[in-house]
């Protein structure tokens, strides 16, 4: 007879996210040894990071004369991922909308405002973006505050939307939201730093 697993053995938790890393590559989590090469570290607004599954849809089959279910079937709920990034950096805009949606503006000049600072001939530089529908694919790695544990979510399919609701107190930000396109694939992993080479 196998011994019961006691509650102290169940304290295997993940919390306190500190850093979110993004890689455009899909990660094969069915392999025992995996390399992930992030391209960018994303600044994520506190408490905006969410990863949760919707409740399952339960179908109840009943027969005459019995109060309970004769049979039940279910469909799993969608896995939802979302977070908010308060940045308008070029690298971020490229991730969100694609290379072809980005144009670098080398000089934009304001004229006739009557404000010498705004009308300066030096002009302004920046980035123009077409905020089109663009599927963000790849892998995100969430690092805990002790850098000892990781949560990896791959096969992501996210979309970005501009958010600037509280313009007096908050910066321009983009909300990433979407799901996992990983039917039949291992798409989530929780990892703990190995104590020696080769440990996981």
PLM-predicted stretches and their roles:
Residues 3-7, 86-129:
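Charged, amphipathic alpha-helical segments
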Residues 28-31, 90-93, 142-153, 184-188:
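Short, surface-exposed beta-strand/loop "edge" segments at domain boundaries and coil↔beta transitions
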Residues 42-59:
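N-terminal beta-strand/beta-hairpin edge segment
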Residues 57-69:
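Short acidic (Asp/Glu) patches
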Residues 68-93, 169-185:
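Oligomerization/assembly interface segments of phage tail-like spikes and tubes
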Residues 119-165:
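Acidic, glycine-rich flexible loop segments
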């Amino acid at each position: 007879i196998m011994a019961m697993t006691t509650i102290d053995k169940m304290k295997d938790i993940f919390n306190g996210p500190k850093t979110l890393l993004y890689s455009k590559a899909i990660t094969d989590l069915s392999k025992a040894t995996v390399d992930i090469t992030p391209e960018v570290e994303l600044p994520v607004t506190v408490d905006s990071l969410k990863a949760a599954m919707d409740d399952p849809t339960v179908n109840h089959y009943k027969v005459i004369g019995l109060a309970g279910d004769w049979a039940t079937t279910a469909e799993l709920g969608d896995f939802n991922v979302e977070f908010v990034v308060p940045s308008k950096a070029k690298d971020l805009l490229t991730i969100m909308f694609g290379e072809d949606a980005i144009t670098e503006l080398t000089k934009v000049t304001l004229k006739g405002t009557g404000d010498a600072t705004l009308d300066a001939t030096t002009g302004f530089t920046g980035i123009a973006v077409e905020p089109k529908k663009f599927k963000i694919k790849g892998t995100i790695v969430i690092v805990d505050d002790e850098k000892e544990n990781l949560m990896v979510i791959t096969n992501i399919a996210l979309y970005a939307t501009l958010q600037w609701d509280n313009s007096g107190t908050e910066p321009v930000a983009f909300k990433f939201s979407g799901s996992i396109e990983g039917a039949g694939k291992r798409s989530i992993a929780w990892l703990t730093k190995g104590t020696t080479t080769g440990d996981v």
